[in-house]
Amino acid sequence: MNTEIPDLEKQQIDHNSGSDDPQPIHDDMAPVSRIRSSGPNHEYIHIADQKFHRDDFYRAFGGTLNPGGAPQPSRKFGNPAPLGLSAFALTTLVFSLCTVQARGVPNPSIAVGLALFYGGVCQFAAGMWEFVQENTFGAAALTSYGGFWMSWAAIEMNAFGIKDSYNDPIEVQNAVGIYLFGWFIFTLMLTLCTLKSTVAFFGLFFMLMMTFLVLACANVTQHHGTAIGGGWLGIITAFFGFYNAYAGLANPGNSYIVPVPLDMPFVKKD
């Protein structure tokens, strides 16, 4: 099967040339005279004399932290999203397991090291690399949540004296609740940017948003059951993160199980 799209080459008139004839624009880019598709289900795209698979074009995909259709970046580097997503997911999982008191461990101190170096430094570095990849959404998300985990670790560490600066434990919990509510607002903003993406991508940010909201409520109300609920939401969030990270790592060349992106139900297909 072969379909063609009419000539896309455009010319502009140089009004200063004194000629009524259109003058072509000359630059370093080769003109694209024709785009066509071929193969079963139009899986190949032909641009001039070059052939690409449709999968070579970026689309909404959790494995790249790309919330919508986007052109390929001009620089060729490895995909930093799986590193950032894995760092986020593992740190979130350990923290959330402590929150639900798995195996009788309510103290989240074991997650401080992860929050500093993996969920913090590694995730932040992955976010910086997303800027190089020209992915603004991925950069904003990974650097911000890397900063979140480092700031949470600072709150938990006695060396910073943050908790000791408050007069009583109730005041500490209220302050942490305000802190988490701020992160709920930020995550709500990101979630709204994933409505045209995939189910797994949207699910990650929606569940994270709900986790922040429930944990914020648990802190300001000092309600133990609400905190447990927030912990379970965090566990679900972590597995969404692991799934999106795996989606960015797996391909037909290294795995027999390659996730297929499932678009949100109301997203229009091109």
Curated annotation (Swiss-Prot):
Protein's UniProt keywords contain Transmembrane: yes
Protein family membership: Belongs to the acetate uptake transporter (AceTr) (TC 2.A.96) family.
GO cellular component term of the entry, any: plasma membrane
Induction trigger: By acetic acid and ethanol.
Modification sites for Phosphotyrosine: 58
Result when mutating residue 74 to H/D: No effect on sensitivity of cells to acetic acid
Residues annotated with Phosphoserine modification: 74
Membrane topology field: Multi-pass membrane protein
PANTHER family referenced in this protein's UniProt entry, alphabetically: ACCUMULATION OF DYADS PROTEIN 2-RELATED (PTHR31123:SF1)
Molecular function (Gene Ontology), one example: acetate transmembrane transporter activity
Top-level taxon of the source organism: Eukaryota
Protein name: Glyoxylate pathway regulator
Effect of residue 58 to E/F: No effect on sensitivity of cells to acetic acid
Predominant cellular place of this UniProt entry's protein: membrane
Gene source species: Yarrowia lipolytica (strain CLIB 122 / E 150) (Yeast)
Task of the protein: Plays a role in the adaptation of cell metabolism to the utilization of acetic acid, possibly by inhibiting an anion-transporting ATPase and affecting the plasma membrane H(+)-ATPase. May be indirectly involved in the repression of genes encoding glyoxylate cycle enzymes.
Localization, UniProt: Membrane
Keywords of the record: Membrane, Phosphoprotein, Transmembrane, Transmembrane helix
NCBIfam families associated with the record: AceTr_1
Parts of the chain that traverse the membrane: 80-100, 109-129, 137-157, 175-195, 198-218, 227-247
Stretches for region Disordered: 1-33
